[in-house]
A protein has these predicted regions:
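Metallo-beta-lactamase
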Residues: 123-176, 183-190
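Short active-site oxyanion
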Residues: 7-8, 63-68, 129-131, 179-181
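Active-site metal-binding motif and surrounding structural segment of the metallo-beta-lactamase
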Residues: 28, 32-77, 148-155
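Divalent metal-coordination and catalytic microenvironments
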Residues: 19, 48, 100, 136, ...
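Active-site environment of divalent metal-dependent phosphoester hydrolases
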Residues: 35-36, 50-54, 76-79, 91-94, ...
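Core dinuclear metal-dependent hydrolase active-site scaffold
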Residues: 1-39, 85-148, 211-219
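A short acidic, amphipathic alpha-helical/loop segment
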Residues: 57-62, 78, 142-146, 168-172, ...
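Binuclear metal-ion centers of metallo-dependent hydrolases, dominated by the metallo-beta-lactamase
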Residues: 8-9, 83-95, 170, 174-219
Length: 219
């Protein structure tokens, strides 16, 4: 008998995730290097226009006739390729029992993702559960506002090169206070170090380390 869930989260590598709702809606977040034959998408969301987050070839593989492609207003020109819908940061998009909100995501110290680009983090909500995909970001003040949003699962970059290292990423988790934190965009680092750090900083936050294409997390 399969486990019941409101959201099922599967890591596809890099910053790419497949999220399914309990009602069978299939959402892809930042799909990249997607294999042929993967399950088609109801909704695809890209956090920003860098090729490893808005990957046209992967998006095309996941498209069906009624797939909806979403992203922040700042990548409207990219979205046109798929007749996509831009969303203003802070606004939400509702689809059946699903709510999608885009919030700021940017670098503070590094030059790769400036705040002025108005790129996005993504919050998906369904059935009283939520998943936050931080996009390519560093620790930013807006994250502290997420502590009031009761995030179930936070997907946090920790590769260090273009985003955060383990120390900063775990600080973000402490700011956000999700029930579960999942490290991503990790560039083959030992993710157990992320787990050890966060367990010391806030043992109330559970760390789940997903395997690429492995068993998904059900919440």
């Amino acid at each position: 008998m399969s486990e019941e869930f409101q959201l099922q989260i599967e890591w596809l590598g890099h910053a790419a995730f497949r999220v399914k709702t309990g009602n069978g809606i299939v959402i892809y977040l930042d799909p990249y290097q997607i294999k042929d034959g993967e399950e088609k998408a109801d909704i695809i969301i890209s956090s920003h226009s860098h090729f490893d987050h808005f990957h046209s070839e992967s998006i095309q593989k996941l498209m069906k006739e009624d797939t909806i492609v979403l992203g922040p207003e700042s990548i409207a020109s990219n979205l046109k390729e798929f007749n996509g819908q831009p969303i203003k940061l802070g606004d939400s998009f509702d689809y059946k029992d699903l709510s999608i909100e885009l919030i700021p995501s940017y670098n503070v110290k590094k030059p790769n993702h400036p705040k002025s680009n108005r790129w996005a983090g993504i919050i998906v909500r369904s059935g009283g559960k939520s998943v936050y995909h931080a996009g390519d970001t560093e620790r930013i003040p807006e994250m502290k506002n997420l502590a009031d949003k009761n995030i179930t699962v936070a997907l946090l970059p920790c590769g260090g090169t273009y985003t955060m290292d383990f120390d900063e990423s775990t600080d973000c988790a402490v700011d956000i206070k999700p029930q579960i934190a999942i490290p991503m965009h990790n560039w083959d680092k030992d993710l157990n170090k992320f787990k050890e750090l966060l367990n010391k900083k806030d043992p109330n936050i559970k760390v789940v380390i997903l395997e690429k294409g492995g068993t998904p997390l059900n919440v």
